[in-house]
């Protein structure tokens, strides 16, 4: 049956409703987006397909579609190309190109590109190190995100950076409040996101938070395990009425974490790979009935 724009758009909607897309679903999704790109020349579809390839770590193809959209002056494509070159996804990092694309996007109000541009000033990538410039940019983004409700708004990324600035300035109370908000935003985002970088963000937020406040097991949530599972312990977890035991321990001088008869080398591998009923553990955040330390 020949594709139409309406049918192709329906394929996209149906694909995003799938819990576990199969190979055939992926092919149909790709074909639909390629059709929409050909028929509409809409850069939004180009970035959408580029983003899918990026998530699959097929970075060469992601770059191709981002460049296609950038030629149409699509601001989100500039941001995405900044990531490609900043992290060296298609070779070595190219900070000159990264700065170029982040600057293009930032100048058009893209907040993600703005905080990445700030990072380049902080680290001295392509530009001279300029920490005051970094602080100025990050602080300027804070009012733009106050009142944000979309879990994919860059609240965790900006607030966690601003929290570190406040710690340096001696304002730990404000830093703690920012980290608590960032943690809740990122926890909610992970219910819906399978992007490989989102777990790294929540990990650093949790560790930064517990460098400022004392951990209290009575108020523990799922992502506090990034802090708890760094040393030997035993926990009980209930998700949707089913009990699980999580244990971090040493055996023959080797540290590992176990849950549901599976072992993990460290807390990063645990969060990346632990599954419950074929769903990632981290996506079960809202289904946790209780989580407690055991003796």
Say what each PLM segment does:
Residues 4, 8-11, 33, 46, ...:
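TPR repeat positional signature
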Residues 20-24, 55-60, 71, 89-93, ...:
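Short coil/turn and helix-start
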Residues 40-43, 72-75, 87-89, 108-110, ...:
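Short helix-capping/linker turns of helical repeat alpha-solenoids
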Residues 116-119, 149-166, 190-213:
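TPR/TPR-like alpha-solenoid helical repeat scaffolds
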């Amino acid at each position: 049956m020949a594709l139409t724009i309406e049918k192709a758009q329906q394929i996209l909607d149906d694909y995003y409703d799938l819990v576990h897309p199969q190979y055939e679903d992926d092919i149909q999704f790709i074909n639909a987006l390629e059709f929409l790109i050909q028929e509409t020349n809409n850069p939004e579809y180009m970035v959408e397909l580029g983003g899918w390839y990026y998530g699959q770590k097929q970075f060469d193809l992601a770059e191709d579609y981002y460049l296609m959209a950038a030629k149409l002056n699509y601001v989100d494509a500039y941001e995405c190309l900044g990531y490609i070159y900043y992290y060296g996804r298609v070779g070595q990092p190219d900070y000159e190109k990264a700065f170029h694309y982040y600057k293009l996007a930032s100048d058009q109000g893209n907040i993600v590109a703005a905080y990445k541009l700030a990072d380049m000033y902080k680290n001295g990538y392509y530009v001279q190190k300029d920490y005051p410039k970094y602080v100025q940019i990050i602080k300027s983004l804070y009012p733009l995100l106050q009142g944000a409700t979309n879990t994919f708004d860059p609240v965790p990324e900006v607030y966690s950076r601003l929290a570190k600035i406040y710690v340096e300035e001696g304002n730990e109370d404000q830093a703690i409040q920012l980290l608590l908000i960032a943690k809740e935003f990122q926890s909610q985002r992970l219910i819906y996101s399978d992007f490989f970088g989102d777990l790294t963000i929540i990990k650093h937020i949790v560790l930064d938070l517990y460098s400022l406040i004392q951990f209290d097991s009575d108020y523990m949530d799922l992502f506090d395990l990034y802090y708890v599972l760094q040393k030997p312990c035993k926990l009980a977890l209930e998700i949707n009425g089913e009990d699980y035991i999580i244990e971090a321990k040493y055996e023959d001088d080797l540290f590992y974490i176990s849950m549901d008869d599976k072992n993990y080398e460290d807390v990063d591998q645990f969060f990346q790979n632990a599954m419950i009923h074929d769903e990632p553990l981290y996506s079960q955040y809202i289904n946790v009935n209780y989580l407690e330390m055991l003796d």
